Amino acid sequence: VPEDNYLNKISTPKVADAVAKNDMKAAWLAELADLNVCSQKGLVEMFDGSIGAGSVYMPFGGKYQLTETQSMVAKLPVAHGKCDTVTMMAYGFDPYLASWSPYHGAIYAVLESLSRIVTAGGDYKKIRFTFQEYFRRMNEDPKRWSQPFAALLGAYNAQIGFGLPSIGGKDSMSGTFNDIDVPPTLVSFAVDVAKEQDIITPELKAAGNELLYFTIDKDEYDVPVYAQVMKLYDAVHALIQKGAIVSAYALDGKGLAAALAKMAFGNKLGVTVDTDVTTDTLFAPGFGNIVAEVPAGKTAEVYEALHNAGLSANVKRAGAVNEEAAFICGDMKLAIDEALNAWTGTLEKVFPTRATEDKEEVKTDLYHADSVYVCKHKVARPTVFIPVFPGTNCEYDSAKAFERAGADTIVKVFKNLNAEDIRESVDEFTKAIDQAQIIMFPGGFSAGDEPEGSAKFFATAFRNAKMTEAVMKLLNERDGLALGICNG
């Protein structure tokens, strides 16, 4: 392994300078403000995380929605009944590590994606991977072929080590523009299945809880000792299921400080770091390592579980959750709001999270009704018609919501493969509207939001004379209701 080992050094220059000057506060603030650590909430919120009822947790957690999650978890969509089976997905990749060593970059991409599933409560043994590869353009220079070879060798090493396959993927070797090359890229996506009740989220839950740090072993070539990693992750998974671990975070190319801060932001709880935690642990890469929040009465259970697995040397106390809303590390006391300003400030002007600085309260008098209007056409169970167009995606959720409330639903797909299909669909839709008391337009991307904007397909179809007449009769003659969500 070369002397300038990326895995053993503090990679952010400003952080390294602050550590060299023994300025812990400056080091924490520089780490949180770093482009690879800072908040991307403004960018994330451009993509709607609230559509659909299947999501188990939001992209940001905690009372203040500031702890970023490391994976996505969603229930399987079923037409009837309840489902507690969830799918999980997480990714891993560090371009700086891959640039230093494509071989290690691929190994730790696989490990990082796997560890993020584990910290959310997933069982790593059920994981399957898919790899996205992107390399510089290959030419007659044989040295250029070394990068994809080394990266794929690393990914293969990790698959054999964990006994888990990659069952799909995509590659491109066109990442060159003039004399600019992309870093050797192998992004690992880990996909898993689990039960909803086993899922945990990464934000800190309560003051007084202890923070334990689990570490992986590496061999002399800085490759993970897979047998030890699997034993450790088995133990962590079992402890999560028993409720001994209530939140956890998988470390990446940054150290423990960034992980603890991100866990703390969601509920604005502080952290007191133990004095024996080194600056390397706080700021150097920690791929595969996990920090976990453990209720005070459960720490003995955790230590015992690790001891029984022969892993006593791989767990130590890193600190505790405090009530002071501050990060305390030796002589340093950093207020959580100051840390938050550093973390959110880097990209706030690029991807703003606040629409305006105007704090004027907006009055919403929309729902203030002096009298309740009662429908003149009474039915025991109202029927709701839900029209489905190619691209809509919340008809299941909408139908379930109405059925839970006591309504009957008619869900029909608008078929548009040929003219005959369209004519049949118009007749079916008209018949369904005539039977309904409510029409509910679901959300999604009808016709991919083409041409030029959302719901054009909806609007075009419902301009058909038969359907227009049926809707007008529903609203004006039968005292019916129409509503929609998103595209609808």
Predicted regions, residues:
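Glycine/proline-enriched, intrinsically flexible loops and inter-domain linkers
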Residues: 1-438, 442-447, 461-472
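Cysteine-nucleophile active-site neighborhood
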Residues: 446-488
